[in-house]
Each structure stands twice: as structure tokens, then as C-alpha cells.
């Protein structure tokens, strides 16, 4: 780390990003990081807000799929386990492909990839919710949701890093993560969904 006297990693590897300037190496005060690069960054706030809804779907499915499949759709516990596992395993190729699409096809424009993935998530959530006859369609929908939801989880964090200078990257990522975990998971996926289920 530079704090121990080492040079910046870009200089050490002679691998500078396109938008690099010596200015990015200057030390920033906590106030500058927080107010100039995080609190006043409207796009960062938009993606933090969007992250709450990404996490609503992620943890809504993660927390409620076993109960929904067993109690509403009539799965036995063994089939619930397989469906739930498939949802999680589908995340691995989905996240890798999402990153590749974002970098190679859309040239680093993270929002486009995220919007495509989330539109497809919405389609498969509706299919998963409305389908009452086909176990195969339930499983395909759950796998598709797992494949598609983890890409935006990853890309929102990456986009937060893209939107802030290197010295403010942790704070920017922390803001989006806070919105995801606190508002998306704790408030919406757990408290709000639990209240809806009970009433």
C-alpha cells in the first residue's frame, strides 16, 4: 500500500486507466470524500436506490423460496432443496456472463447490462409467481432468477467504483451496499415481505 511508501499500483505495473491523472493520487480529506464525491453524486444515489430493489429480489427469493415452494406450490422438502440449490448455482455463470457483457459488449456501460438483466428478472419473477401447474416451469424460472439477479448485484458495486475516484471508492461502494442490505434486505425483503405474508 502507498501508506507504507510503495508506489501506486498503476505506476508499479505501468498500467494506467484511460482516465488516470496525477490528481487522482492526491490525498482527500474525509469531508471531501463524503461530501464532494459521495453525498453530492446524484448517479451514485440512483444506483444505491436501485440496489435496494435488486436486493429485495435477491433476498426475497433467497429467504422466501423454500417456504413458497413448500407451502404454496406443494413441493416436498427434497425438491425444495434441489430447486433452491439450482437457484444459487445458476448465479455463478450468470455473474460471469454479466461481467463479460458489461465489459466486452457494452464497453463498460454497466447500467445497460443491469437494466437488461433486471427486465429479464421481472419476467421470470412473474412466471414463477403466476405458474401453478408446471414444476419444470417453476424450476426454470427459479434458475433464471438466480442466473440473472447476481449480475446486477455485482455490477452495481462495480459501477459505484467507476463513479468515484480511487480514494473515495470504498465509501461509494459502502453507500450502495448499505442501501442494498439495509433497505433492500432488512426492510423490504424481510420486514415488508414478512408482513405481507402474515396479512
Please annotate each region the language model reported:
Residues 96-107, 197:
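Helix-to-loop junctions at the C-terminal end of transmembrane segments
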Residues 136-144:
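Paired small-residue
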Residues 5-46:
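Juxtamembrane intracellular "pre-TM" segments in multi-pass secondary transporters
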Residues 37, 41-98, 153, 157, ...:
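Extracytoplasmic gate region of multi-pass secondary transporters
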Residues 150-165:
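Intracellular juxtamembrane helix-capping segments at the cytosolic ends
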Residues 119-133:
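C-terminal ends and interior cores of transmembrane alpha-helices
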Residues 166-198:
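A late C-terminal transmembrane helix in Major Facilitator Superfamily
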Residues 103-118:
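Cytoplasmic membrane-interface "Motif A"-like loop-to-helix N-cap segments
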Amino acid at each position: 500500500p502507498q501508506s507504507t511508501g510503495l508506489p501506486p499500483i498503476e505506476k508499479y505495473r505501468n498500467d494506467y486507466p484511460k482516465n488516470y491523472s496525477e490528481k487522482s493520487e492526491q490525498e482527500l480529506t474525509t469531508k471531501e470524500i463524503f461530501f464532494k464525491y459521495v453525498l453530492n453524486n446524484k448517479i451514485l444515489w440512483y444506483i444505491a436506490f436501485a440496489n435496494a430493489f435488486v436486493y429485495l429480489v435477491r433476498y426475497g427469493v433467497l429467504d422466501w423460496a423454500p417456504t413458497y415452494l413448500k407451502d404454496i406450490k406443494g413441493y416436498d422438502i427434497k425438491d425444495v432443496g434441489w430447486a433452491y440449490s439450482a437457484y444459487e448455482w445458476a448465479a455463478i455463470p450468470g455473474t460471469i456472463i454479466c461481467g463479460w457483457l458489461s465489459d466486452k459488449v457494452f464497453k463498460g456501460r454497466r447500467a445497460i447490462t443491469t437494466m437488461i438483466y433486471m427486465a429479464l428478472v421481472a419476467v421470470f419473477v412473474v412466471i414463477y409467481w403466476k405458474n401453478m401447474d408446471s414444476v419444470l416451469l417453476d424450476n426454470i424460472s427459479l434458475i433464471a432468477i438466480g442466473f440473472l439477479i447476481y449480475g446486477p448485484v455485482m455490477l452495481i458495486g462495480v459501477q459505484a467504483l467507476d463513479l468515484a475516484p480511487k480514494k473515495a471508492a470504498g465509501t461509494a461502494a459502502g453507500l450502495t451496499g448499505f442501501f442494498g442490505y439495509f433497505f433492500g434486505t432488512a426492510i423490504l425483503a424481510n420486514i415488508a415481505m414478512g408482513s405481507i405474508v402474515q396479512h
